[in-house]
Amino acid sequence: MAFSESPAITVREIDLSGVVPSVSSSTGAIVGNFSWGPVLKPQKIDNEATLVDKFGAPDTINTFDFHSAAYFLKYTNALQVVRVIDSNGANAYNGGTNPAPIIRDRDHWDLSDDAQDSDGRNFIAKWPGALGNSLEVQVCPFSAGDSAFTNWSLNDNFDAAPGTSDYATARNATNDEVHVAVVDKGGSFTGTKGQVLETFPFLSVASDAKTADGTSNYIKDVLNNRSEYVWHAGFDSDYSTTAGSRAAAGTVVDSGDNFALTTGTINAIDRYALANGGNSTMATSGSLSKFLEGYDKFKDKDNIQVDLVIAPRVTSRTASTTIVNNLVSMAQITRKDCVVITSPPVSDVVTTTTPVANSVLAANTYTSSSYLVVDNNHLKIYDKYNDQYIFIPAASSTAGIMANTDFVAAPWFSPAGPRRGQYLGITSLAYTPTKSERDTLYKAGINPVANLPGQGVLLFGDKTKLARPSAFDRINVRRLFLVVERAIALAARNVMFEFNDEFTRAEFVGVVEPFLREIKGRRGITDFRVVCDETNNTPAVIDRNEFIANILIKPARSINYVTLNFVAVRTGVDFEEIAGIGF
């Protein structure tokens, strides 16, 4: 501590209140082909309505990926979604003669803004997809006598006609304002043709225009920063041409500038209908590289938290093996804090006479790992967006059941069985395995999804895909350790850069033991011990600037096999005499 050179009172505050923080363990992650939304940019979704708002309603091609995401959200409210597209995915636009642009996200836009302007485009749909073809941008300029505004069918969305902004007035310039409306011309977004999606009143065509609070009021800046539907690339010739004393849109304000239109249709609304947007037509089997690129966005655990990685729907066994084994590598080697959930490929279980044998063959190609959970089925559900029945992998619902287990019990409880393992919102299964078929599946590390009379459709197994006998061959144990490891690792950050002495070690133990006692009290652990003393922090360890703690845990085990012995005895037998006999 610092010493005073004269009498003084020194006040110090010392924080010894460290605890093991609570951590979430139910965030899902999925990659898919969607109709709308940013590409290769994880978006956290909380329910199906938000999924539609962010990624659009599905068509008959991407409905499988959409509903896989939607069915996970039936059980919980945290799903990281990454959209991927193929070469058919393109943004709708107006103007220009070059091929349709592909703008994936804001970063991509910032790199291509000037190029889009040079290509002669005025407005571009925010995201790739045919949905953008439904958009129209209407711009109301200043006009003499406000004739354009007066005759505009959308003028009731604005308080007054555009004129001269305060910024231009202060610089002796005039007529720089415009109103902008983005309209659902085709009705694809709202179901109503001509519905106004968003409005932007009193914008300026001057590139340096500011509002009273100092933020940009330039039409390009405002639309590109705030619009949910379009990018503004550049102006058409009516706006960008300098004619006489008229100043061109997109230039800075000079004294005497008049931005009023003098060419083209000067007293009417400018309408920019977008076209040529395209949807991806990819199936997963033919676009493995795209899907793997999407899942790569989940690799960095320091930047994004995921707990349940849902493998996508695939049509072939080869594609399934490639994707699943790549995801297991990410979970087990790269992140070490999540599990992968997968179902067999479509062709192995839907409309086939040998789904059990096929499922076993597919599962045998996967990496043996406690970070992988495999189920056996596909779910028949109703697609309300396209009025059809479809089959989707059970994996997303299996992951949802695991996430919901966290809420109704804890991560260290088994997600299987009638209490927590019920599947929601399904019409039927691709097939229901018999008892002997369930035995075959379970021996192969596959958790049966079965329709049991009187109980409904249940997850009827809680194995991981670890081939060797171990505590980690059960889902609840694997997830217990993931939660404990994540939480204690966060608490251990407070040890960094401290001294490796008795005080620091005692403080660490004092933080960790109450956390583990709580889990023991909640039935996740039968016993534990924390070793962090001079026995494992030897002088050699200390001299290497290291700190070691050994955390020994006896995990609770789920019941998989129940035996009920019914014993008939003579009338005169004392039950106490035979109660302890093994049967």
What are these model-predicted stretches?
Residues 1-110, 121-122, 126, 179, ...:
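Structured, hydrophobic secondary-structure cores that serve as assembly/anchoring elements
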Residues 51-55, 90, 100-211, 218, ...:
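Extended, beta-strand-rich, solvent-exposed assembly scaffolds of outer structural proteins
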